[in-house]
Amino acid sequence: MTFSHDGIRDSLTHLAAPPYFYENLRRELGTAERNKSELSLIRFLISKNVAGIQITESGIESENSQYEVAILSFAEILKASIRSEDLCARLGQLEFTLILKGSSEIATSLAERVLRSWMFEGFDSHYSVLTVNRGESSLEILNRLDNQELRLATKGY
């Protein structure tokens, strides 16, 4: 399984590709700054869990079809859960990031709703939520998002 895109859409999920996501993030930051509105990001990571050992991107190649089904099902739930003004991108083989116009409370609620909807046998899902601070650059925001502690989805919602 390869991670490929045409610059606008991911070839597997048809979610936004990284270049399109980064351009839209810059645009949304400018709009939020001008309108003094809130902007949040949600980062989702999915991983295979075998006997308590998590297999991440490095171990993907051996079980392509199972991963593809998991990735596609997660992407479909994301597409069905977001509003038309929000943007969801696949930024890595198992990483999805959402730009959401709204507060961290709204973002957390959406993240938990998505993870409650997506239960895939043998896979775990994690998320982190970040609210953009005024004056932050795209790079600062993405670095902060990468450093956020991931929350494990609880199976018993």
Question: Where are the predicted features?
Answer:
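Short, conserved charged micro-motifs
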Residues: 50-54, 105-110, 140
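Signal-transducing coiled-coil linker helices
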Residues: 1-30
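Active-site-proximal structural segments of metal-dependent nucleotidyl cyclase/transferase enzymes
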Residues: 24-62
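Conserved helix-loop-beta segment at the catalytic/binding core of cyclic-nucleotide signaling proteins
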Residues: 34, 58-61, 66-104, 116, ...
